[in-house]
Swiss-Prot record:
Keywords: Electron transport, Heme, Iron, Membrane, Metal-binding, Mitochondrion, Mitochondrion inner membrane, Respiratory chain, Transmembrane, Transmembrane helix, Transport, Ubiquinone
PROSITE patterns recorded: CYTB_CTER, CYTB_NTER
InterPro entries: Cyt_b/b6_C (IPR005798), Cyt_b/b6_C_sf (IPR036150), Cyt_b/b6_N (IPR005797), Cytb/b6-like_sf (IPR027387), Cytochrome_b (IPR030689), Cytochrome_b_C_euk/bac (IPR048260), Cytochrome_b_N_euk/bac (IPR048259), Di-haem_cyt_TM (IPR016174)
Described purpose of this protein according to its UniProt entry: Component of the ubiquinol-cytochrome c reductase complex (complex III or cytochrome b-c1 complex) that is part of the mitochondrial respiratory chain. The b-c1 complex mediates electron transfer from ubiquinol to cytochrome c. Contributes to the generation of a proton gradient across the mitochondrial membrane that is then used for ATP synthesis.
A Pfam family the protein falls into: Cytochrome_B
Membrane topology of the entry: Multi-pass membrane protein
Family statement drawn from the similarity comment of this UniProt entry: Belongs to the cytochrome b family.
Keyword Zinc attributed: no
Gene designation per UniProt: MT-CYB
Protein's UniProt name: Cytochrome b
Organism: Sotalia guianensis (Guyana river dolphin)
Spans traversing the lipid bilayer: 33-53, 77-98, 113-133, 178-198, 226-246, 288-308, 320-340, 347-367
Amino acid sequence: MTNIRKTHPLMKILNNAFIDLPTPSSISSWWNFGSLLGLCLIMQILTGLFLAMHYTPDTSTAFSSVAHICRDVNYGWFIRYLHANGASMFFICLYAHIGRGLYYGSYMFQETWNIGVLLLLTVMATAFVGYVLPWGQMSFWGATVITNLLSAIPYIGTTLVEWIWGGFSVDKATLTRFFAFHFILPFIITALAAVHLLFLHETGSNNPTGIPSNMDMIPFHPYYTIKDILGALLLILTLLALTLFTPDLLGDPDNYTPANPLSTPAHIKPEWYFLFAYAILRSIPNKLGGVLALLLSILILIFIPMLQTSKQRSMMFRPFSQLLFWTLIADLLTLTWIGGQPVEHPYIIVGQLASILYFLLILVLMPTVGLIENKLLKW
């Protein structure tokens, strides 16, 4: 008798995606982050659902409803901090996943890559509107500063900002709609993730060498299911350690002060995972220029497949490209540090140099080095 998992219409889909899926035998732990992102998404949706049961999206009660969750709801503090730190784990996995794609040339699967960039933008939007919900000082001022950037768009800017705010400032209407967005977006992310997987399974996974591995495939289960379970346990362990020992390590103390439109915090800054983009935004002394640089810092990922000049897909056998890749990582860490610093000397000039280097590496240096490596190999 044929196995039910191979014949049942629904089981067949799951079987082909997670059980009998032919997978390259050589993929390393860098390929774990896809499944970890799926786990993060499930955890965020579940903790978020329980938080939404007790949260009130109203300016007069939002802050106290979060305090109520932490004080009065059974394990409410735990759910709240799991959700807040879960977002940080989500972005750590996301950046590692993108870094893996850049290093091993996974971006050559163009449909999968483009859906991935769309997923990144959607996750960033979700995190941004979510950060506004506790209605602390940084929530309010973060929302004001970031939405205000749209006013840099010529002609329609001001109208657009007021339309998003639902009034002439960030207020009740803004909070309500941001809650609605924060609730719906994770489900859009889930749908996009399914499409991401669909396109990936059309081509099969890449591997560290970047060479087609059709002649050396193994079934996903049990080999990679057990490997993914190990990754999941490490992720959960890290998240629990963060949540139970230092829940506020990655947060901002200003967000424990209720939102006050009459008092501006000394340093307005987003959560750590947006600091690199915030540093690029601040490094240009022009509003529209800064907004364009901010957008381009993320959207540049779309152009990476077009900037591939090397005849080798992966960086595994390309030491010069590896050097530039790790320089890019160091540059992004520098930008992250600068984004959290006040706007004064020497941080301004360091931020500007790091921003220039970021675009220079991706648009000029990496493609050029790819060509040089081809020459060295006489290709």
